[in-house]
Amino acid sequence: MTAHILLLWLFASSILGDPDSAGRLTRHQVSLKSGRLCSLGTCQTHRLPEIIYWLRSASTKELSGKAGRKPQDPYSYGRRRRRRRRRREARLLRRLQDPSLRRAQLAG
């Protein structure tokens, strides 16, 4: 499906051509236009295998094990960090609330 759309786009752009190519261009205008596509569509047809390869590889990309976790997973990166921070905060709160630990901290 994507290849058909790509081929139709290439065909349409080669038929329509570049709208700015109707008149003569100065050197400055030519240097500015060097990054654009060719008016006859030859650049697109030469790059067609490269474009098709890129589209194919993008659609068949293998997922890595790191990215495959569900967002609800309790061991995902953000939840793991938040849980660790909560544990630290709870431990600090217990130290502050426990009088024996507070005296030991003040003495040391």
UniProtKB/Swiss-Prot annotation:
<keyword id="KW-0372">Hormone</keyword>
<dbReference type="GO" id="GO:0005179">
    <property type="term" value="F:hormone activity"/>
</dbReference>
<comment type="function">
    <text>Seems to have a peripheral vasodepressor effect and a central vasopressor effect.</text>
</comment>
<keyword id="KW-0165">Cleavage on pair of basic residues</keyword>
<feature type="propeptide">
    <location>
        <begin position="89"/>
        <end position="108"/>
    </location>
</feature>
<dbReference type="InterPro" id="IPR051665">
    <property type="entry name" value="Adrenomedullin-reg_peptide"/>
</dbReference>
<feature type="signal peptide">
    <location>
        <begin position="1"/>
        <end position="18"/>
    </location>
</feature>
<feature type="modified residue" description="Tyrosine amide">
    <location>
        <position position="77"/>
    </location>
</feature>
<keyword id="KW-1015">Disulfide bond</keyword>
<feature type="propeptide">
    <location>
        <begin position="19"/>
        <end position="25"/>
    </location>
</feature>
<protein>
    <recommendedName>
        <fullName>ADM5</fullName>
    </recommendedName>
</protein>
<feature type="region of interest" description="Disordered">
    <location>
        <begin position="61"/>
        <end position="108"/>
    </location>
</feature>
<dbReference type="GO" id="GO:0005576">
    <property type="term" value="C:extracellular region"/>
</dbReference>
<feature type="compositionally biased region" description="Basic residues">
    <location>
        <begin position="78"/>
        <end position="89"/>
    </location>
</feature>
<dbReference type="GO" id="GO:0035809">
    <property type="term" value="P:regulation of urine volume"/>
</dbReference>
<keyword id="KW-0027">Amidation</keyword>
<feature type="compositionally biased region" description="Basic and acidic residues">
    <location>
        <begin position="90"/>
        <end position="101"/>
    </location>
</feature>
<dbReference type="GO" id="GO:0003073">
    <property type="term" value="P:regulation of systemic arterial blood pressure"/>
</dbReference>
<dbReference type="GO" id="GO:0007189">
    <property type="term" value="P:adenylate cyclase-activating G protein-coupled receptor signaling pathway"/>
</dbReference>
<comment type="similarity">
    <text>Belongs to the adrenomedullin family.</text>
</comment>
<keyword id="KW-0964">Secreted</keyword>
<feature type="disulfide bond">
    <location>
        <begin position="38"/>
        <end position="43"/>
    </location>
</feature>
<dbReference type="GO" id="GO:0010460">
    <property type="term" value="P:positive regulation of heart rate"/>
</dbReference>
<keyword id="KW-0732">Signal</keyword>
